Amino acid sequence: MPGFTCCVPGCYNNSHRDRDLRFYTFPKDPTQREIWLKNISRAGVSGCFSTFQPTTGHRVCSVHFPGGRKTYTIRVPTLFPLRGVNERRSRRGRSRKVSAVVPIITSVVSTANETAPLEEDEEEGDIENTTVVQIGQNGQYIAPVDLTSSGDGSCITAVVSGGEESAVHESCSVADFALCGADHSYSLTTGTTSTELLRKLNEQRDIIALMEIKMKEMKNTIRQLRVTEARLQDELRQREQERERLICANTIIKRKL
């Protein structure tokens, strides 16, 4: 697509398509330029733009400026709809997801180290009737485990004694569930897929922007070569004409002699 494309990660505004927007070049002032690079999260990008230095071909659209336009008072872009590649993902969203799951889990299960204490006068027969059910990653129930077997208390278990539900501690913290099962093979990874996808998307956009710049440079080179070729052909034509004139003049002189 012709025209300028905004170099902000996640922004695809183009000067040819979005004619109502304005596109600004990076400031020449080193301080302002550094602030711009820090705000748009370009500094430190891996890939072909790991040492990103903006040129006249890199523009920032007016969407990222408060008020939709760069002015004397508003000189730095601060509005970004998508998170940059260098910004860490906020942990607030993760805590909300965990807290939303906690009430459901705490209503039926409790950790092994927080199970209801047995009464001292309870007989051994009651203990033998106690079964432990492990809950897998997708919420399915695994085969019951004998209560007498030793456990490290790192997995979530549901204890059913004599057909009655065990007491559940409602004060179980979110951190207990976040840390629970961290050492198991079925524990969830801490990496976020969206961040990786955004990083790869930014790298692809950087490659496309670099190729567009290279194509413009090659077009300018081809245009200059064509102009040079036409000039050389003109000079060659003039030399051929001068050569023909000299030959004609020599022929006339020989005839006179």
Curated annotation (Swiss-Prot):
Transcription factor, which has both transcriptional activation and repression activities. Binds numerous promoters of genes and therefore can be involved in many processes. Also modulates chromatin accessibility. Required for normal brain development and neural precursor differentiation. The gene is thap11. Its main location: nucleus. A zinc finger (THAP-type) spans 6-64. Pfam families: THAP. Belongs to the THAP11 family. GO terms for molecular function: DNA binding; RNA polymerase II cis-regulatory region sequence-specific DNA binding; zinc ion binding. Keywords: Activator, Coiled coil, Cytoplasm, DNA-binding, Metal-binding, Nucleus, Repressor, Transcription, Transcription regulation, Zinc, Zinc-finger. It comes from the Eukaryota. One of its GO terms (biological process) is regulation of transcription by RNA polymerase II. It is found in: Nucleus; Cytoplasm. GO terms for cellular component: cytoplasm; nucleoplasm. SUPFAM superfamilies: Glucocorticoid receptor-like (DNA-binding domain) (SSF57716). Residues 196-251 form a coiled coil. Disruption phenotype: Morpholino knockdown of the protein results in severe craniofacial abnormalities. At 4 days post fertilization (dpf), morphant embryos do not develop the major components of the viscerocranium, including Meckel's cartilage, the ceratohyal and the ceratobranchial cartilages. At 2 dpf, knockdown animals also show structural brain abnormalities. The keyword DNA-binding applies. This is THAP domain-containing protein 11. InterPro entries: THAP_Znf. PROSITE patterns: ZF_THAP.
